[in-house]
């Protein structure tokens, strides 16, 4: 794991306390789901439309919505300004897990985020419209989504991450609405293997994707994150792995997002010179 300099962090986060970044609320039509879906985009103060900026797609957790990150944390505007990037928070449904459901055609959130929303954002803002200018991460259900979408769409995203992510769904067959969209585990074991992050590791090659994983040691998802970390090490897949004291709550995520943005900023800077 890379060690971030605490003094550097303190300098960054006290540089700007005015939060001049702007927030737009968007409504984007999804052809795959035949409905309008809301998102918010945080635009850094420096954005005037004349410079292409990278984009972080930031996913919410189970039972939340597109404005959860904006309402429940206070640092997104400041982080967008410091790192000069767009932050897009799409609505991922109450319990979509960011899949294209093989059972319910009204839940096609992988297609919406990795294709439809990205196309709309690139057409309406001056973005770095390539994998070198895109990253995806999230918390809990969105942590699963960040890695799931990143692993499966490496032509779209160059970096991905997870905070307190449900990175292996198989130990939780009766939780968080998952069986509505991939079927009962006992009847559809292949779906449960194929729609979990742990089932996507064969898609990875060393160095092709920048990956960051963060989980609190007292989180109920800690063990599945540890298992993912061990498997990535076994496969020789480089990744940053952060374990700190903490549980599954907004206090943890409000801190974790700062480390994630540093990681993604380093990726964007090194790939867009």
Q: What is each model feature region?
A:
Residues 20-273:
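Non-catalytic cap/lid and distal C-terminal segments of serine-dependent acyl enzymes
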């Amino acid at each position: 794991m890379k060690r971030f300099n605490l003094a550097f962090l303190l300098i960054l986060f006290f540089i700007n306390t005015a939060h001049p970044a702007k927030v737009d609320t968007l409504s984007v039509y999804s052809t795959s789901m035949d409905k309008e879906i809301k998102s918010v985009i945080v635009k850094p103060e420096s954005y005037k439309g004349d410079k292409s900026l990278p984009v972080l797609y930031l996913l919410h957790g189970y039972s939340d919505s597109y404005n959860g990150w904006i309402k429940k944390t206070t640092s997104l505007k400041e982080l967008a300004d410091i790192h000069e990037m767009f932050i897009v928070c799409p609505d991922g449904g109450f319990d979509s897990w960011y899949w294209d459901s093989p059972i319910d055609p009204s839940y096609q959130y992988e297609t919406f985020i990795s294709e439809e929303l990205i196309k709309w954002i690139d057409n309406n803002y001056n973005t770095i419209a390539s994998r070198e200018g895109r990253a995806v991460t999230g918390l809990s259900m969105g942590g699963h989504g960040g890695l799931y979408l990143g692993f499966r769409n490496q032509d779209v995203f160059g970096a991905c991450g997870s905070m307190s992510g449900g990175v292996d769904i198989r130990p939780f067959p009766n939780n968080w609405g998952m069986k509505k969209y991939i079927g009962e585990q006992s009847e559809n074991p292949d779906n449960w293997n194929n729609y979990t992050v742990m089932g996507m590791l064969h898609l990875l090659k060393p160095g092709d994707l920048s990956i960051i994983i963060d989980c609190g040691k007292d989180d109920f998802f800690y063990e599945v994150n540890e298992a993912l970390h061990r498997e990535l090490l076994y496969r020789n897949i480089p990744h940053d792995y952060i374990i700190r004291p903490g549980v599954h709550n907004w206090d943890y995520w409000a801190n974790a997002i700062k480390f994630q943005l540093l990681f993604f900023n380093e990726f964007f800077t090194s790939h867009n010179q």
